[in-house]
């Protein structure tokens, strides 16, 4: 039993269901109970009787046998039944609500500010050494301020200085070709003057020829044309002194004088290399160890110092003959005892190993 004014059941929604169950059970028990005509077995009847005894042992049935009046009195009022009112939020002043909404708006604006304020405020990366796409095109190129040369300034200068060899100390190919042409013309000029002097025509004055040749020498007074200028000066002098002789002949004669000076050493070289020029150089001490050794190739000991005697004058023959030995070096090597070179070395000899 419960006190009046308070609901007996915690959940008021289940009250009607319990009422229907109580009515059915009370109607069932008010009748004769399970009749013999019913289809229940005896075991089921015994079970129902036991259940009735268990219910009656307490002396009363507080939940099942209550009257409708008690049920109606125990029911909560309709206001309380429909009082499943949702939890009402605490009252908030309109000022606080405005501040909360303003804070939310600021959060959304914080994400959109970088995109909207980028044009008005300077970008951090624009100030940094990194280049951003927002930098206007009016700014100058970074490399124009640096020691590097910009592409715009390099473009017009490339065709002018495309060839590296055009710079000093190199010269153009055309200039070299022109120099070769001028060399040929300068060589033909003295020949023509020589022919004019031989035929008896009016020869050019010597002073004019010298002026022409000196101008040519002044233009090409480089290291590569020193020999040519010397030849021209010799030809001019020869044309002045000997009108009947061509300057080429004088050049050849001047060359002949220089060749006469070199005849002396050349004759000595021929005397030295003459008899031994056809044979390859082979040291006599190592000749017997060679694969192509034959005793016929060995010169006689008397024939070796002949070449030396030709070079030296007859007065020094005896002094040198006394100092130079006539015997060959190969004969000296044969005189040495045929000892095993490994016997003298720190390696043990084969003879010592044998018992």
From Swiss-Prot:
Residues 325-334 have a biased composition (Polar residues). Keywords: Acetylation, Phosphoprotein. It comes from Homo sapiens (Human). InterPro entries: AP2_assoc_SerThr_kinase, BMP2K_C. The modification N6-acetyllysine is found at residue 19. This is Uncharacterized protein FLJ45252. The modification Phosphotyrosine is found at residue 293. The keyword Phosphoprotein applies. Residues 1-104, 247-310, 325-355 are annotated as: Disordered. The modification Phosphoserine is found at residues 175, 294.
